[in-house]
Amino acid sequence: MSRTGTWLKMLVAGTVICVGGPAFVQSIRPTDEELFKRYNPDLQKRSLEEGDRRAREFDEYVTRLKQWSKSDKSIWFAAQEQQEQKRAEIESQRSQAKEDARLQREEMRKELLGEK
């Protein structure tokens, strides 16, 4: 067989593999609706209930990623800074709650001692 024939066969085989492979995978892959129908009823119900919440969480995450990407820093450093800010905020809320509880206890002691 001539070299041209060999090259032609290889081009045809490569085209079949490159085009036919993804087309075959696409044809056997189930759609989202087909996968959802395979769920048991409890999973279907839970999926429908949590779908909106998950979509909101994903949208919030994408929004945060966009904000982080606008800064000059790496996304990872920006995310770490935001986590540190949240931790500091939570810690300040805890300390404020502890202080309020301490003040309330002192007031209760004063009331009890004043009434005796």
Curated annotation (Swiss-Prot):
Region entry Disordered, spans: 87-116
Membrane topology: Single-pass membrane protein
Major site of localization recorded for this protein: mitochondrion
Coiled coil: 77-116
Transmembrane regions listed in the UniProt entry: 7-25
One Pfam family this sequence matches: CBP4
Family: Belongs to the CBP4 family.
Name of the protein this chain belongs to: Assembly factor cbp4
Organism: Neosartorya fischeri (strain ATCC 1020 / DSM 3700 / CBS 544.65 / FGSC A1164 / JCM 1740 / NRRL 181 / WB 181) (Aspergillus fischerianus)
Gene: cbp4
